[in-house]
């Protein structure tokens, strides 16, 4: 498994395969999945974290069932751009996953994704209890949608480059 940049992922992704977004928390892993055209992110179930081995197995089973081509995992960078303990934990999780799968990972700056997800859920008048259940997958969708938009931008740039004289 490799940790790729978004540009490297854009070059390597096979067509018509889904990409998964992950919001790694201490108690849960929020998951979202793209459509086959990689335009839209849809929230999915949450994996309740137990220990790394069980978490990895649940994630890999999900990836196999959904035919996931890559994972976009939120990197919880501090507002000032520095990396704290949560970033270190995310990087360690990705490193450990690398021993279990060949599916590539992309680290995606997730600043304010949970805040944005919570605002949307509040605007949808979702109760506090239901918000708590859905927030991680909603945040994973924000992470994935940002990455999908970047992939689309890279694809437009690549097709524009081919037309240049």
UniProtKB/Swiss-Prot annotation:
Superkingdom as given in the UniProt entry: Bacteria
Q: Which Pfam families match?
A: RuvX
Write out the GO MF terms: nuclease activity
S-S bridge residues: none
Q: Where in the cell is it found?
A: Cytoplasm
Q: Under which main EC class is this enzyme filed? A: hydrolase
Write the record's keywords in alphabetical order, separated by commas: Cytoplasm, Hydrolase, Nuclease, Ribosome biogenesis
Which Gene Ontology BP annotations are present?
A: rRNA 5'-end processing
InterPro entries, per the entry = RNaseH-like_sf, YqgF, YqgF/RNaseH-like_dom, YqgF/RNaseH-like_dom_sf
Q: Name one GO cellular component term.
A: cytosol
Q: Which SUPFAM superfamilies match?
A: Ribonuclease H-like
- EC identifiers of the protein: 3.1.-.-
Function as written in the Swiss-Prot or TrEMBL entry: Could be a nuclease involved in processing of the 5'-end of pre-16S rRNA.
Q: Which family does it belong to?
A: Belongs to the YqgF nuclease family.
Q: Which HAMAP family match?
A: Nuclease_YqgF (MF_00651)
This protein is called Putative pre-16S rRNA nuclease
Source organism (scientific name): Rhizobium meliloti (strain 1021) (Ensifer meliloti)
């Amino acid at each position: 498994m490799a940790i790729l940049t978004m540009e490297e992922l854009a070059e390597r992704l096979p067509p018509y395969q889904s990409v998964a977004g992950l919001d790694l928390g201490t108690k849960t892993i929020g998951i979202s999945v793209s459509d086959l055209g990689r335009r839209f992110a849809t929230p999915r179930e949450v994996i309740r974290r137990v220990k790394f081995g069980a978490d990895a197995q649940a994630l890999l089973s999900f990836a196999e069932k959904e035919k996931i081509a890559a994972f976009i995992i939120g990197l919880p960078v501090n507002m000032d751009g520095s990396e704290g303990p949560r970033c270190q934990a995310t990087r360690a999780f990705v490193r450990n996953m690398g021993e279990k799968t060949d599916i590539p990972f992309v680290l995606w700056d997730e600043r304010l994704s949970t805040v944005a997800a919570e605002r949307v859920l509040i605007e949808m008048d979702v109760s506090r209890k239901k918000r708590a259940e859905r927030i991680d997958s909603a945040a994973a969708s924000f992470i994935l949608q940002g990455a999908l938009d970047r992939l689309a931008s890279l694809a437009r740039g690549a097709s524009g480059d081919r037309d240049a004289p």
